[in-house]
Structures are given as C-alpha cells and as structure tokens.
C-alpha cells in the first residue's frame, strides 16, 4: 500500500515547490499516475496476491474504494480551476494541499487493518473537508453548512466509537485480519441490532 500512500503524500512538497504556472499541471498529472498505479489493485483477487501488513492492506472489498478515491484529486482539480482562478497563488496551493491531504487520509482509511485506526483516519478527513467548505464554498451559507457538518459528524461518530469499544471488549481485538479467524457464531439479538445501527450511523451522517 505504500506505493499509493507515499506518492500521494509526496504531492504536498510537489505542490509548494512547483512554480505558479505549472502547479496545476504537475499535481494533476502525478495524481493521474497514482490512479493508474492503483488500478493494479483490482487484479489482486486472491489472498496470495495481497500485501498484508500490520497496518495497511487491500482486499477485493477495499480495492475498488481505493481506486475511486484516487480519482478524487484529479477530477476535483480539473473541476475547480475556474472557480478559484481569482485567488492568490498561496491560497491556490493551500487549496490543492488540502485536497491532497483529504485523498491521502481517505486512502489510509480504506486500507487500514485496525478498526480504531480506521475510526481516527475517518474522522481526520473532517478537518480538510471542513476547511474547504468554509473557505471555498460556493454558497453564502457555507459557514453555517460547515458548522452543521462539524456538529452532525461529531455526534454521529460517538456511537461508532462506543461500538468499537464494545467490539474490542467482546472479541479482544480490532484487527480485521484476526477477526476473520474468529469462528464464534453471531447471536441475532436486539443488542447486535443496536450495535449495527451505531456502526452505520457515522457513515449515514456523511452520506449527504
């Protein structure tokens, strides 16, 4: 997974070291190259081809999400150039840096093996998203939208954290690879339904 995470992170120094005229071309081109590299994950259909590690890995479920995430940066760069063309060069590079941070955090989120790491990275995406909404939002109500986004996201993430703590106490681990080795049956009780609702609530809040 480092072949995707590390190049995505290195887009930050590329953004600030590139000249003002070439920063859009450089970041867009290299982000498209990262996307082409990530497409290789779609052909890793069996466990022998997966590069497992204690922190990050890709499987047939997360690989399509990773490929879609790598499309996020180049498409947003192409769509927003005209919108922020009147901004200063410093603000343009700051905007690109926030998009790069958002993509890197999303890649690490979808490839995380530990559920608590997934939770931390998933909530960390709130920071660049909130700054982009409140600073470069197109509507005049962007500040109110940012406040509502922050409030609903934090409120929706608390049940997910409680559910993860409960899973940790129940199974003894939050590692997804180790949890697949657990063959204990899942009881269909009302508490498990509440647990499922708590886990899905954080994603439903961010869906809009």
UniProtKB/Swiss-Prot annotation:
The keyword Membrane applies. Core subunit of respiratory chain NADH dehydrogenase (Complex I) which is composed of 45 different subunits. It is a multi-pass membrane protein. It comes from Microtus pennsylvanicus (Meadow vole). GO terms for molecular function: NADH dehydrogenase (ubiquinone) activity; ubiquinone binding. It is found in: Mitochondrion inner membrane. Its main location: mitochondrion. The keyword NAD applies. One of its GO terms (biological process) is mitochondrial respiratory chain complex I assembly. Keywords: Electron transport, Membrane, Mitochondrion, Mitochondrion inner membrane, NAD, Respiratory chain, Translocase, Transmembrane, Transmembrane helix, Transport, Ubiquinone. This is NADH-ubiquinone oxidoreductase chain 4.
